[in-house]
Amino acid sequence: MKLPFAESYKIKVVENLRKSSREEREKWIKEAKYNLFNLQSQQVFIDLLTDSGTGAMSDMQWSELMKGDESYAGASSYYKLKEKIREILGFEYFLPTHQGRAAENVLFSVLVKENDVVPGNSHFDTTKGHIEFRKASAVDCTIDEAFDTQVEHPFKGNIDLKKLEEVLKNNPKEKIPFVVVTLTCNSSGGQPVSMQNIKDVHQLAKKYGVRVLFDSARFAENAYFIKIREEGYQNVSIKDIVREMYQYTDMMTMSSKKDAIVNMGGFIGIKEEEIFRQASTFNIMFEGFITYGGMSGRDMNALAQGLDEGTEFDYLETRIKQVAYLGEKLDSYGVPVQKPYGGHAIFVDANKFLPNLPREEFRAQTLAVELYLEAGVRGVEIGTLLADRDPQTRENRYPELELLRLAIPRRVYTNNHMDVIAAALKNVYDRRSEITKGFKIVREAPIMRHFTVELERA
């Protein structure tokens, strides 16, 4: 008999969860202005808002916390992290930052100017926000298959080379600071980019004299999918795949709170000394001295250990199979989700779930609120609220995909929790015809509004 799959870890510490009544949840979500970011954590039973910084660190990571060097300059923890980044990712120069958006802020302060054009694969919210804050434009060049949730394409994060070349041809290279490759592509459903596409994008960018930047938050999950899905990589280790991937970029930004499995931290990897020197000035201004950059020594130690653990096959297999378990459950219930299942989250297709709800009433946000009311499960909208308004017209931008993201924290929940999530969504799906009203905006920020938006029933 073939042995069943089991997790590659055992549980050493637990945290109690509190269940709540529907009446309590109705009160709490109304007080939160129907914005799930405004809920207190104790008002949530299963928290799938994000996989960023919410994972469980290992005993080895906890032991590294005790060995952190908190020297202001030249801490040994910095050099430990520097060596680990060089070993795994191959960057000679790096700058620590407190998280991924800080890495973007520092690097984009050097490279992105007004009226620039930044092509890539479905830039995530902070990436697009930092670009548009600088009065530049983000151009989505993702393949069309990414926008049909039922198409089984193994690499829906791929960049369409024709779309990319159109941007590169029609704009002077001085106006294109870099091409962004997001690994994996969060906004299209945690979808990976193939090694071949990475190579092709790099070659095309170099043809036009443009740099390549990897948004690397989930780079290890991307490497796992290359190993599993791309011909010729089945017998290659995750670390070797990662090293090959990073031959084809000039720079990287990293939110370490994802694939390095820490609660806080990020960094920039740079291959050109001059960009490193310019970025160092902004790092000192915004983050801190270049050998800590907003991170404590103990956090740098835990991050170095996490980079090792996060690029191990057994860990990645356990993590991604749990995400797939939830996807398969939902699929068996008829709930429409992005296929194939992503690396860090399941993305529910709100357009197919609530097709009769006017898109102006925020389908994915409505679905997120309904799931919370049903079972105390907190997901997040990846749709019209997140897309923000057009900077010129101030009209809503309606993305091709309107998704409810269920991001699974690493090494935190069991499959019993996945069963609860799936059953709750099935219950909402069974009564979807009764959901006829969504939300309207009461108050919003001019950029990245989804974090603080206030809503009321339409």
Give the label of every model feature segment.
Residues K2-L36, Q40-G55, Q61, E70-F94, ...:
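Conserved PLP-enzyme active-site core in the AAT-like
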Residues A103-V106, F347-A350, D390:
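Beta-rich nucleic-acid/ligand-interaction surfaces
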Residues S137-D140, I270-Q278, R298, L373-E400:
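Flexible glycine/proline-rich, aromatic-decorated loop/lid segments
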Residues S255, Y341, I382-L385:
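Acidic carboxylate-rich catalytic motifs and surrounding loops in phosphoryl-/glycosyl-chemistry enzymes
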Residues I275-R277, P355-R363, R411-V420:
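Short, conserved charged micro-motifs
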Residues G310, E374, L386-A458:
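PLP-dependent enzyme catalytic core of the Aspartate aminotransferase-like
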Residues V323, N351-R378, Q392-P399:
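Active-site loop ensemble at the mouth of alpha/beta enzyme cores that anchors a bound cofactor
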Residues V323-A324, Q338-D349:
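Conserved glycine-rich beta-strand-loop-beta hairpin in the small C-terminal domain of fold type I
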